Structures are given as structure tokens and as C-alpha cells.
Amino acid sequence: MYAVLVTGGKQYRVAQGEKLRIEKLEVEVGSEIKFDNILLLGDSDGIKIGDALSGAAVTATVLSQGRADKVRIIKFRRRKHHMKRQGHRQYYTEIEITGIAGGSK
């Protein structure tokens, strides 16, 4: 069984046992979190699609909090002896999917 969930303004296709990095959530490491905003549920019988399926939920365990690798940004103006360097490290929460509960549309 798999599901498409929405968190942090992004959509993720998940299955039980998967590990993934999502936008940072203010939760403790080791805690259990529940996602209710599920757009799609799929299994061998077919799929259920809807805007926030009622009764559907995905549970996950928080594995770690961290920061991604640095992304380097360089702005350069030719022939003007001008260059601007900047860097960014995005915060993330790493989770493991522990369960997918189905619901009705």
C-alpha cells in the first residue's frame, strides 16, 4: 500500500518502511507523528483519490533533525569586476513511515 501526503507545501509518495527527509517540523526525535492530509491511497485493489481523504492517515517516527548540504549561489557580472557569493543550508526532519491507514472518500 502507498499514499501521497502533503507536508511543508510539498507532496510525497510514501510506502510503509520508507525513510525520507521533509521540511522541518518542530517535534522531538523519537516521537510519533500523524499526517492527515492524504491526497491518494493505492493498493492492489485500486486507488482512492480525493482532496484530503477522510479517515486516511499516515503515521511516522521522527529519526533525526538536521541541515542539508550547502547550496552555493554565485551572482557574477561580466567585465564589471563584481561577484557575489552566498550559501544556504535547509533544515529538514528525517522520518520513517510506520503505518498507512485507509479511509473512505
Curated annotation (Swiss-Prot):
Cellular component, GO, one term: ribosome
GO term, biological process aspect, one: translation
Pfam families on file: Ribosomal_L21p
Coiled coil: none
SUPFAM superfamilies: L21p-like
Cysteine pairings via disulfide bonds: none
Domain of life: Bacteria
PROSITE patterns in the cross-refs: RIBOSOMAL_L21
Entry keywords, A to Z: Ribonucleoprotein, Ribosomal protein, RNA-binding, rRNA-binding
Molecular function as annotated in GO: rRNA binding; structural constituent of ribosome
Subunit structure: Part of the 50S ribosomal subunit. Contacts protein L20.
Family of this protein: Belongs to the bacterial ribosomal protein bL21 family.
Function according to Swiss-Prot or TrEMBL: This protein binds to 23S rRNA in the presence of protein L20.
Protein name, per record: Large ribosomal subunit protein bL21
The gene coding this protein: rplU
